[in-house]
């Protein structure tokens, strides 16, 4: 049930927006620097029912690698791939569930660290990627998800 308008909105923001930003940045980064894109665990592993979002974030990951290869050694380019980060947007995803409490409990159980992420978890990764300590890192996707993608999504109650 995806429309062309849905495609334009999602790919416009997540793909075209990142592409245009990088295209604008590269000429002024001749002396070097670090580009940090916002990917998603949904670009690494497809989430059901989110084909466009998954594809748009996979594009960001591919573009990140291409920029790293084409514009090194002076420009580094990496992406952060967040999992569940408790923001207003993430909270609204639970609000549409039949049982909001059960949905949160189920999602939380999939995080080996025992909590959802908070914005500072992502900010700390961005800080490291922006600084000189990460000077040997480029073309990588950094998953910041509390271990969400480390485990299989299989339901243990099936066994």
Please tell me what each predicted stretch does.
Residues 1-8, 107:
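Substrate-binding pocket helix/loop in short-chain dehydrogenase/reductase
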Residues 22, 56, 64:
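Active-site helix of classical SDR
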Residues 27, 69-73, 135:
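Alpha-helical segment proximal to the catalytic Tyr-Lys
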Residues 40:
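Residue(s) in the substrate-gating loop at a strand-loop-helix junction
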Residues 45, 138-159:
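Short C-terminal tail/terminal secondary-structure segment
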Residues 72-76, 81, 137-139:
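Short, small/polar-rich loop/turn modules that mediate ligand/substrate recognition or access, typified
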Residues 79, 101-133, 137, 144-146:
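C-terminal helical subdomain
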């Amino acid at each position: 049930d995806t429309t062309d308008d849905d495609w334009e909105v999602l790919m416009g923001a997540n793909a075209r927006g990142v592409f245009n930003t990088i295209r604008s940045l590269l000429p002024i980064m001749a002396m070097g620097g670090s580009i940090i894109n916002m990917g998603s665990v949904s670009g690494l592993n497809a989430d059901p029912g989110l084909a466009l979002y998954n594809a748009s974030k996979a594009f960001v990951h591919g573009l990140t690698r291409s920029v790293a290869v084409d514009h090194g050694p002076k420009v580094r380019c990496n992406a952060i791939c967040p999992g569940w980060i408790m923001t207003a947007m993430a909270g609204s995803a639970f609000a549409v569930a039949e049982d909001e409490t059960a949905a949160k409990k189920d999602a939380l159980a999939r995080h080996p660290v025992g909590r959802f992420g908070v914005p500072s978890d992502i900010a700390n990764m961005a800080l490291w990627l922006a600084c000189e300590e990460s000077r040997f890192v480029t073309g990588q996707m950094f998953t910041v998800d509390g271990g969400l993608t480390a485990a299989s999504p299989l339901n243990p109650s099936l066994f």
